[in-house]
Amino acid sequence: GLAFVARWNGQTMGDWPYSVAEHSLLVEEIFHRANPGIAARWRLAAVLHDAPEYVIGDMISPVKAAVGPGYGELDLRLTAAVHLRFGLPAVLPVPIKKQIKAADKVSAWLEAVKIAGFREVEADKLFGKPAPEMMKGRKIRLRPPTEVRADYIATVARLLSACD
């Protein structure tokens, strides 16, 4: 599962690899903070935003570029399948997709600075400087994969039940 798929190609500080599942939980938290009162289905979409990586792994950007357009096409097809499985539209509305991407960039900035060894100025260039209110109280948690998996599954279940 996603709790066992390392982000940053596993090149992070700490006792545990930072997983796609942990990243996805953080993205959902940031997305929700930026969009209070947003429907549970869109929060579910946020937590599932990297779900295709259970099949294709979390490839670093230079590798994605080297693979070419086939990677993007596969990612889109897997994303559509995951969305349909969880009762979401195959293709998210553009404003929702943009809001999730914005939360993803805040998460990437935090990860880069806190656990991947980037200086803030480097992260600013790559991901944009996050708004201070999005950063307040945000921490990167490195936890055992089994704990992350349980948290991820519980979050998905809670959001799914809120969609009914």
For the regions a language model picked out, list residue spans one by one.
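Metal-dependent phosphohydrolase cores
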Residues: 1-164
